[in-house]
């Protein structure tokens, strides 16, 4: 059994939606990133990679590599799951906390869970996503960006 933690942040930029957990959410800003900016999936990738002692997302998908420009982060997550399996591990469960003042996450959480479960090849009951604000404190409270913490439990195949 292995446990990993992931954390990622993206700042807001020009745009009219954010993608979180593979779900497109209307918003008055987008997220600045080399890929599609799915900060939730990036944190999950790091948690999975960390649990398997495989480094981090930047090592596997560097933002200097043009192949990953604008890439759908679901593709990255699926690749990470394959790497983890090659090392003899399977996902036991994942849990993530989105830290954002806006947009409101509650209407989108279940679709995020379903999308993530599909990519992880696990049941939706093995995926938890929740959201909180910082009561208008810090960069997320000032609506400058979104942060996500994620943990993953891996079990031997």
UniProtKB/Swiss-Prot annotation:
For this protein, the Enzyme Commission number is 4.6.1.12
Q: Which domain of life is it from?
A: Bacteria
Q: Provide the residue positions that the database annotates as binding 4-CDP-2-C-methyl-D-erythritol 2-phosphate.
A: 8-10, 34-35, 56-58, 61-65, 100-106, 132-135, 139, 142
Look up the record and name the cofactor or cofactors this protein needs: a divalent metal cation
Instruction: Answer yes or no on keyword NAD.
Output: no
Q: Name one Pfam family in it.
A: YgbB
Q: Could you tell me what reaction this enzyme catalyses?
A: 4-CDP-2-C-methyl-D-erythritol 2-phosphate = 2-C-methyl-D-erythritol 2,4-cyclic diphosphate + CMP
Q: What is this protein called?
A: 2-C-methyl-D-erythritol 2,4-cyclodiphosphate synthase
What's the gene?
ispF
